[in-house]
């Protein structure tokens, strides 16, 4: 089996580079093919998915991301399949169990073993957010869930196809458990089609260069990345770093939740130890271990080698310690459907631990939360009682850098290449009117020599007779941190007006009526440096564009 520890094999360097890039572009082509064919806006518009190729042991070889937060889950999913199904065939397999190889039930992984002459050479993997997979709330993820059984359909490494064709009984089971069955199955079929593209590209390389040469190239890719990663780590600041923070609450209880990190960096290891963090909580913010590993990998790449390949060799020095039963490694039946709240903190803890050591690479704290929202129901405004759902992240303000203001209205660290859905797509396809999408200049921005970036304000007007709203926003009570005297950011929250009046940070399945208004406000990032040192020209610019939330100094 191919692993990063195998003996380095020398091959023609030109052929090697062609194959290396061929594998990367195969993953990328799979990624774009899925986006083009998908039915749900959360896939084709928001890009909440990822595609990858692993070796036959599940070691990540190449990955294409909409969501960097998936950097640690696809290889875990493959290893989980290998351990559960020793009898793997040339068929597609489907899974979404969070604890062993996932995130939350909405994120459905499909895996295709690449068999050649009876042997498994590689695995082709695709993970996408299905908008609806059952559960207690429309859209499936549930801020008020207290066990995984409330969050949707659990699929434990099931064989999805027979002879490459979706098994009718499995498909009917999936449809029966979805409030939007046509969208759900349409996205599943798009995943399968995109994976066939990647398989075809790999077999084309087999035909052109030879199977053994391609497999040797895989081994060398991982070994080269490992060597590069270790060389860069030697030049990276070493030491032990300690950080603590608090998550607002778990959506069930009001008490803040303590999280902590001890980060140890040596010549050949990058150890993130979350021992001492809270135990798994009653609410759905628990982060499965694969998601926690992803959180650490995201910062490692950003701080150590932003230009590295996303593969097992690059991540070789990383070790994550998260005690079983903790908020960063929950076990069944703890809910995980809004796992991103804790996962984002895992990223932020590592980020905060390193920022003083590598100030030119990392920023002050950002608004952090995915700020995920679901608006769904039955469309009796545009269409004849068809179900609809829009699931999306909400962008906000990033932290200031050592030499510049923070970026405004970007998605959080775990969401990377994802987008908030455009107003045009929403209004064309859903019974919703987007009445505002602007910078958040109403809440005072954080202050510093360099200020944090601004959040945003978005307003949705409900046009159907009824709808439901779910939202999960972190950093509402504990805003983004500043650095070197810079101020904190501002909170994230939502407001509802109309038939109900409400201001909050976490809610599941709130019933709304026609003309109700959902108002989403994300916060600013933290600032860098003493506000007294801010350049006067920058202050005047902020006043001119009304960035200061009404302040005059």
Regions found by a protein language model. Name each.
Residues 92:
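Glycine-rich phosphate-binding loop of nucleotide-binding enzymes
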Residues 2-89, 97-116, 120-553:
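Glycine/proline-enriched, intrinsically flexible loops and inter-domain linkers
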């Amino acid at each position: 089996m191919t692993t990063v520890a195998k003996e380095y094999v020398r091959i023609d360097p030109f052929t090697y580079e062609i194959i290396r890039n061929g594998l990367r572009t195969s993953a990328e082509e799979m990624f774009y093919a899925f986006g083009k064919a998908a039915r749900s806006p959360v896939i084709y518009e928001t890009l909440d998915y990822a595609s990858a190729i692993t070796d036959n042991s599940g070691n990540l070889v190449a990955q294409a991301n909409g969501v960097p937060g998936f950097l640690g889950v696809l290889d875990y999913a493959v290893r989980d399949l290998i351990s559960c199904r020793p009898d793997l065939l040339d068929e597609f397999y489907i899974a979404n169990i969070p604890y062993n190889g996932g995130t939350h039930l909405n994120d459905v992984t499909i895996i295709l073993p690449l068999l050649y002459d009876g042997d498994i050479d590689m695995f082709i993997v695709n993970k996408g957010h299905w908008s609806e997979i059952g559960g207690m709330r429309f859209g499936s993820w549930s801020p008020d869930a207290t066990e995984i059984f409330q969050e949707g359909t659990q699929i434990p490494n099931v064989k999805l196809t027979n002879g490459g064709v979706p098994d009718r009984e499995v498909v009917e089971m999936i449809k029966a458990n979805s409030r939007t069955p046509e969208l759900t199955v349409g996205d599943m079929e798009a995943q399968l089609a995109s994976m066939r593209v990647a398989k075809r590209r790999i077999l084309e390389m087999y035909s052109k260069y030879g199977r053994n040469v391609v497999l040797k190239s895989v081994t060398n890719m991982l070994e080269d990345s490992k060597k590069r990663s270790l060389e860069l780590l030697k030049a990276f600041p070493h030491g032990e770093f300690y950080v603590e923070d608090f998550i607002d609450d778990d959506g069930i209880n009001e008490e803040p939740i303590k999280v902590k990190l001890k980060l140890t960096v040596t010549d050949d290891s990058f150890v993130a130890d979350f021992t001492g963090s809270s135990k798994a909580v009653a609410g759905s913010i628990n982060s499965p271990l694969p998601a926690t590993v992803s959180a650490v990998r995201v910062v490692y790449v950003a701080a150590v080698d932003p230009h590295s390949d996303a593969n097992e060799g690059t991540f070789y020095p990383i070790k994550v310690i998260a005690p079983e039963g903790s908020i960063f490694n929950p076990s069944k039946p703890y809910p995980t459907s809004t796992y991103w709240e804790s996962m984002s903190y895992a990223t932020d803890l590592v980020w905060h631990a390193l920022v003083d050591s590598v100030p030119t690479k990392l920023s002050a704290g950002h608004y952090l939360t995915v700020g995920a929202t679901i608006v769904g129901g039955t469309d009796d405004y545009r269409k004849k009682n068809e179900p609809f759902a829009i699931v999306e992240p909400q962008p906000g303000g990033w932290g200031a850098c050592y030499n510049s203001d923070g970026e405004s209205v970007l998605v959080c660290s775990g969401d990377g290449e994802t987008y908030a859905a455009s107003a045009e797509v929403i209004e064309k396809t859903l019974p919703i009117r987007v009445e505002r999408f602007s910078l958040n200049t109403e809440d005072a921005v954080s202050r510093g020599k360099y200020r944090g970036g601004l959040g945003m304000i978005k307003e949705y007007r409900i046009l159907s007779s009824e709808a439901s709203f779910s939202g999960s926003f972190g950093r509402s009570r504990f805003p983004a941190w500043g650095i070197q005297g810079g101020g904190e950011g501002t909170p994230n929250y939502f407001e509802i007006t109309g038939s109900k009046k409400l201001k909050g940070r976490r809610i599941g399945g709130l019933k709304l009526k026609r003309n109700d208004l959902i108002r989403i406000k994300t916060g600013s990032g933290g600032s860098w440096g003493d506000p007294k040192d801010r350049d006067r020209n920058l202050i005047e610019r902020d006043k001119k564009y009304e960035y200061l939330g009404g302040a005059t100094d």
